[in-house]
Amino acid sequence: MVGGGGVGGGLLENANPLIYQRSGERPVTAGEEDEQVPDSIDAREIFDLIRSINDPEHPLTLEELNVVEQVRVQVSDPESTVAVAFTPTIPHCSMATLIGLSIKVKLLRSLPQRFKMDVHITPGTHASEHAVNKQLADKERVAAALENTHLLEVVNQCLSARS
């Protein structure tokens, strides 16, 4: 580990992560702008919501680190479900729960309440995958985490636009 500072400050676990190219912005269609036409939520819309979340350790987005990809987002608008699998940059990433919590909070703040969300680690990509997924799936733990003012501040930093 080397010194450095991301959102949480402190030491970096992955000092030299691979950086991926951002995908292009999705063009808005006339149908999407028409308020009279029902607009279902799809995987690209969810990806657009989470792609710019800041990594807690690096001055990069989750998309730039390939932590989130559109292919790992599943949506069923009729069933009101969203599933997002995310891949930490290293198998022992201690920030995995914070990253998952940031994704979950972004979705909670952005989507209609009818949606049920499943935010989880991509299978086989993290040493503590089961424990992290269990925490992220536990509504009471998530609510308690968001009552912690310091943790909420860190999540909000991950969700804020970088200048």
Curated annotation (Swiss-Prot):
The keyword Cytoplasm applies. Belongs to the MIP18 family. It is found in: Nucleus; Cytoplasm, Cytoskeleton, Spindle; Midbody. InterPro entries: FSCA_dom_sf (IPR034904), MIP18 (IPR039796), MIP18-like (IPR002744). Pfam families: FeS_assembly_P. Gene3D superfamilies: 6.10.250.1280, Fe-S cluster assembly (FSCA). Its main location: nucleus. Disulfide bonds: none annotated. It comes from Homo sapiens. Component of the CIA complex. Component of the MMXD complex, which includes CIAO1, ERCC2, CIAO2B, MMS19 and SLC25A5. Interacts with CIAO1, ERCC2 and MMS19; the interactions are direct. Interacts with KIF4A; the interaction facilitates the transfer of Fe-S clusters to KIF4A to ensure proper localization of KIF4A to the mitotic machinery. Interacts with CCDC117; the interaction is direct. Component of the cytosolic iron-sulfur protein assembly (CIA) complex, a multiprotein complex that mediates the incorporation of iron-sulfur cluster into extramitochondrial Fe/S proteins. As a CIA complex component and in collaboration with CIAO1 and MMS19, binds to and facilitates the assembly of most cytosolic-nuclear Fe/S proteins. As part of the mitotic spindle-associated MMXD complex it plays a role in chromosome segregation, probably by facilitating iron-sulfur cluster assembly into ERCC2/XPD. GO terms for biological process: chromosome segregation; protein maturation. GO terms for cellular component: cytoplasm; cytosol; cytosolic [4Fe-4S] assembly targeting complex; midbody; MMXD complex; nucleoplasm; nucleus; spindle. The gene is CIAO2B. It comes from the Eukaryota. This is Cytosolic iron-sulfur assembly component 2B. Keywords: Chromosome partition, Cytoplasm, Cytoskeleton, Nucleus.
